[in-house]
Every structure is written in C-alpha cells, then in structure tokens.
Regions:
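Helicase P-loop NTPase motor core
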Residues: 1-66, 89-94, 125, 147, ...
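Conserved short internal alpha-helix adjacent to the catalytic or cofactor-binding core
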Residues: 10, 62-68, 73, 77-107
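Amphipathic alpha-helical transducer elements in NTP-driven molecular machines
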Residues: 11, 21-28, 40, 50-53, ...
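A residue-level signal for conserved active-site and pocket-lining positions in enzyme catalytic cores
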Residues: 27, 45, 84, 112, ...
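AAA+ P-loop ATPase catalytic core
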Residues: 31, 53, 100-103, 119, ...
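Accessory C-terminal helicase-associated subdomains
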Residues: 32-35, 39, 107-110, 133-242
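Helix-hairpin-helix
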Residues: 84, 101-123, 142-144
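A short beta-strand-loop micro-motif that forms or neighbors metal/cofactor-
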Residues: 121-136
Length: 242
C-alpha cells in the first residue's frame, strides 16, 4: 500500500495516448502550460525504458524546452543509434569516411584494422575517397586477401542505396536494419543490454516517422540534417535551466 505524509495535493492525471508521439506531445504541452513562474529544471519526466526517451526528447527539441538526462545517455548519443546513423550517412554520402570507418566492420565482417589502414593508404596515394578503394579492392594487390569481404560490404551499401530510391523512408530503414546484420547481431546476443540496444535501433524508426510528419518533402539527407541539429547540443551546464 502506497501512502505519503505530505498534505493533500492535486489528483494524479491519467492520459491514454494514441501513440508515443501523442504521449510525448502531451507531456511537452503540459510542461509548457505549467511553466509560468517556474523554471524548466523544476520539472521531471520518468520513463520505464531507455527507448521511450526518444519521442520525449524530440518533442522537447521541437518546442525549445531545455533538458538533460539523469542516470542515462541521450538517445542520439547511444552507440547503437550512432552506428545506425553512420550507415544512413554512408548510404547518403559514400565520401563520409569517418562514418565509413565506424561501420565497415560493425557488425564484425572480418575486415581488420590492418586492412582498413592499407585501404586508407591506397586512397591517399590515389587521391580518391576511401569508399572508391573499398568498392574496387581487386584493383589493389595489397587488398587481395580481404577483397571478397570488402566487396560484400559495399554490396550491402549499394543495395540499400537502390532501395532508398524505391521505398518510403520507414520501409527503407527496416531494410537497412536487416541487410546490414546489425539488428540480428544484437538479437543473437540475447542478453538484457543487447535487447535494450536492439530496442533503441528499432526506435530510431520513430524519429524518421516524426520527421516525415513535420516535413513536406522528406528525404534521407533532410532527416540526417535534422538529426545533426539534434546532436549538436552543448554539454550540460549546471547553471542552465534544464
């Protein structure tokens, strides 16, 4: 039995939302309506699973409400979310070498650090993007042993790029999750942490849907630009109203 020694206060309100976006917008609007004469840091939102923070974070960002995560990590700062965004970035722009380096052996494909270093040296010597070398490894004798694995990776990227031209963004993302093997890797591990990470990977689709709802002509490039704005947030300032 739950009880409190505090004096009687406002009754608890129950709101049955139609979706996680509706739920997040309700929370946001409620905070805004109650914020007169208060600081945003006077409010707290409790959620049960990490993935649930995504919709609330997105709603706060659109409404200009400052926030910070206590005892956890911002949705777009989570490694698995960064990994999937890296895939999307490379599919959108093959010249994105930083993201390419992040995903080329993630999940493991037998493409080791030495192979990547050799590919980088070849790219630098030829004055071409790293992806150009990786997608044509048989032209470089030093990459011959890893050529099949490198080709298999670039086939995944190219197939996903073709699907981008044919499918709506949410369906395209479903294919990326499957074809890259990233979601399968997490599901096969089966531990609690991996299941949570898999849930976060799926939750990224909600961000795509939210972006589409607020954009007349949604594109992958546009989505990535919006996410870049979300993630370009300064570290927590203890004196800030968040």
């Amino acid at each position: 039995k739950l009880w409190t020694e505090n004096a009687a206060g406002d009754q608890i309100t129950v709101y049955e939302a139609s979706s996680e976006t509706d739920e997040a917008n309700f929370v946001t609007n409620r905070i805004i309506s109650m914020s007169k004469g208060k600081n945003f840091k006077d409010f707290a939102v409790l959620y049960r699973t990490n993935a649930q923070s995504n919709a609330v974070e997105n709603s706060f960002k659109r409404s200009g409400i400052p926030y910070r995560i206590i005892g956890g990590t911002r949705f777009f700062d989570r490694a698995e979310v960064k990994d999937m965004l890296a895939y999307l970035c490379v599919i959108n722009n093959r010249a994105d070498e930083l993201r390419l380096q992040r995903i080329i052996n993630n999940p493991p494909r037998g493409i080791g650090g030495k192979t990547l270093e050799m590919a980088e040296r070849q790219a630098a010597a030829a004055g071409v993007p790293l992806y150009t070398v990786v997608s044509d490894p048989y032209s470089y004798p030093s990459l011959e042993k890893a050529a099949a694995k490198l080709m298999a990776f670039t086939v995944i990227i190219e197939e996903c790029a073709e699907l981008l031209q044919k499918l709506p963004l949410p369906d395209f993302y479903e294919e990326v999750m499957t074809r890259t093997g990233y979601l399968q890797m997490l599901e096969e591990k089966g531990d609690v942490e991996s299941r949570t990470r898999a849930e976060n990977v799926r939750e990224l689709k909600s961000s795509i849907l939210s972006y589409m709802e607020n954009t007349e002509t949604p594109t992958l490039a546009g989505f990535l630009e919006e996410i870049a704005l979300y993630t370009d947030i300064e570290q927590y300032d203890p004196d800030a109203d968040a």
